[in-house]
């Protein structure tokens, strides 16, 4: 099994080493019920407009698994989790190399750690 693990690391390493893109979330730590949560993800080490990538928002409620919120393409095309669609807006600002999440009418059920991802 050690040999297999080592082999898998070798195969995966080149793509990992070449991937210099970093994403950093920013926004308020707390939002009151009924308010709108606004988060921004800043992309560094590469252009948000280059490559065939979808830029996503994901969240993880305490003690639960990951929940996909939605994604956006640099052109502005979006797709949202149907269960959140009525409250979610994801937008992109290519001039700032950022994409953003707005989640309206938050409740205790929206308590989670929010992540941006490519």
From Swiss-Prot:
Region span, Framework-2: 55-71
Compartmental location: Secreted; Cell membrane
Entry GO CC: extracellular region; immunoglobulin complex; plasma membrane
SS bonds (residue pairs): 41-116
Region (Complementarity-determining-2): 72-78
Cleaved signal peptide residues: 1-19
Predominant cellular place of this UniProt entry's protein: secreted
Molecular function via GO: antigen binding
Pfam families, alphabetized: V-set
Record region (Framework-3): 79-116
Stretches for region Complementarity-determining-3: 117-118
Residue ranges annotated for the Ig-like domain, each copy included: 20-118
Stated role: V region of the variable domain of immunoglobulin heavy chains that participates in the antigen recognition. Immunoglobulins, also known as antibodies, are membrane-bound or secreted glycoproteins produced by B lymphocytes. In the recognition phase of humoral immunity, the membrane-bound immunoglobulins serve as receptors which, upon binding of a specific antigen, trigger the clonal expansion and differentiation of B lymphocytes into immunoglobulins-secreting plasma cells.
Subunit structure, interactors included: Immunoglobulins are composed of two identical heavy chains and two identical light chains; disulfide-linked.
Protein name: Immunoglobulin heavy variable 4-30-4
Native source species: Homo sapiens (Human)
Underlying gene: IGHV4-30-4
């Amino acid at each position: 099994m050690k040999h297999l693990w080592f082999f898998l690391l070798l195969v995966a390493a080149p793509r990992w080493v070449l991937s210099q893109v970093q994403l950093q979330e920013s926004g308020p730590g707390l939002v009151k019920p009924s308010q709108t949560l606004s988060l921004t993800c800043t992309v560094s080490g590469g252009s948000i407009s280059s490559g065939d990538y979808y830029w996503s928002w994901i969240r993880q409620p305490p003690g639960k698994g990951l929940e996909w919120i939605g994604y956006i393409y640099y052109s502005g095309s979006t797709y949202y989790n149907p269960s959140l669609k009525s409250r979610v807006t994801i937008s992109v600002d290519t001039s700032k190399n950022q994409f953003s999440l707005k989640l309206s009418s938050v409740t205790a059920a929206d308590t989670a750690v929010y992540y941006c991802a490519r």
